[in-house]
C-alpha cells in the first residue's frame, strides 16, 4: 500500500491510498516531467539551430530550454549560464549526474562571444565545482569555422581532458546550417579539407588521452567522417 499526499495549487490537500504489487507502476502521470515550468535559455548563440528553424511550425519547436534537470532526466545539454548556486549545490548534494555541458569553447572571452552572454565565460567555473565534487559530466563542442576551431579547439580539448575522469567524454560536432539564416551571425560550412584537419586533431588527442587515462575521451561525430570521406573507426 502506498499513501500519497497531494497539495493542490489552491492549498487543498488530498490523501490517497494506492494498493499495488511491489514492482507494479503506481499509474501516476505528471503533466510534464519536471512538475513545474521549464527553464529557458538566456543565451543568443551564434550557431543556435532553433533560430534557423523554418517559420509557421508548432510553437513548442521554438522553445529554447536550458534546464539542468532535463540534463539529468533526459540527457539534454546545458550551457550552465542560468544555473544558480543553489542549483549547483542541489546537483552536488543529490548526485544528479551525469550533467551534459554545452561547452563550445574553454576560452572565456570566446565563449561569451559565441553564446552572446557576458556571463558565459564565468559559468565555466561550474565545471570545476562539479569536478571537485565528483559529479560525472559529458561535454559537447559545436564547431564553427574560423571561430572555435584550430588552436581554440585544441585548447578546449586539452583543458577539458584535465577534468578526467569526471568529464567522461567530449563530443565535437560541426555547426548545422539551414537556409533560414537571415540576420544571423555569418557562418560558413566546413569543407572536406577542414574535416580532415579536425579529424587529425581529434585522433591525436584520442591517442594522448588513451595513453594517459585509458580512454579516448574526445569523439568526432559521424558528419566529420562523411565530409572527409574517411571510414568510420572500428
Each model region followed by its residue ranges:
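Well-ordered beta-strand positions in beta-sheet-rich domains
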Residues: 15-17
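Conserved PDZ fold ligand-binding element
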Residues: 1
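Conserved Radical SAM active-site core
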Residues: 13, 22-166, 176-204
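Glycine-centered tight beta-turn/hairpin loop motif at sheet-sheet or coil-to-beta transitions
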Residues: 9-11
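Positively charged, polyanion-binding regions of nucleic-acid-associated proteins
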Residues: 173
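Hard-cation-handling environments
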Residues: 189, 196-234
Amino acid at each position: 500500500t502506498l499513501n500519497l499526499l497531494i497539495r493542490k495549487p489552491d492549498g487543498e490537500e488530498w490523501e490517497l491510498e494506492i494498493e499495488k504489487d511491489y514492482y507494479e507502476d503506481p499509474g501516476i502521470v505528471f503533466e510534464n516531467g519536471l512538475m513545474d515550468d521549464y527553464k529557458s535559455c538566456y543565451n543568443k548563440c551564434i550557431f543556435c539551430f532553433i533560430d534557423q528553424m523554418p517559420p509557421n511550425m508548432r510553437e513548442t519547436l521554438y522553445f529554447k530550454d536550458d534546464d539542468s534537470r532535463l540534463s539529468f532526466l533526459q540527457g539534454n545539454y546545458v550551457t550552465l549560464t542560468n544555473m544558480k548556486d543553489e542549483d549547483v549545490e542541489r546537483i552536488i548534494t543529490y548526485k544528479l549526474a551525469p550533467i551534459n555541458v554545452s561547452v563550445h569553447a574553454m576560452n572565456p572571452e570566446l565563449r561569451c562571444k559565441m553564446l552572446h552572454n557576458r556571463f558565459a565565460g564565468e559559468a565555466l567555473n561550474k565545471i570545476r565545482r562539479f569536478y571537485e565534487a565528483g559529479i560525472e559530466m559529458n561535454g559537447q563542442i559545436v564547431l564553427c569555422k574560423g571561430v572555435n576551431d584550430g588552436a581554440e579547439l585544441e585548447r578546449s580539448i586539452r583543458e577539458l581532458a584535465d577534468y578526467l575522469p569526471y568529464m567522461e567524454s567530449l563530443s565535437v560536432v560541426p555547426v548545422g546550417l539551414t537556409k533560414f539564416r537571415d540576420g544571423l551571425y555569418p557562418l560558413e560550412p566546413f569543407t572536406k579539407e577542414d574535416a580532415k584537419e579536425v579529424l587529425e586533431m581529434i585522433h591525436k588527442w584520442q591517442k594522448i588521452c588513451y595513453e594517459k587515462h585509458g580512454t579516448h575521451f574526445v569523439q568526432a561525430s559521424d558528419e566529420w567522417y562523411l565530409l572527409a570521406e574517411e571510414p568510420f573507426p572500428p
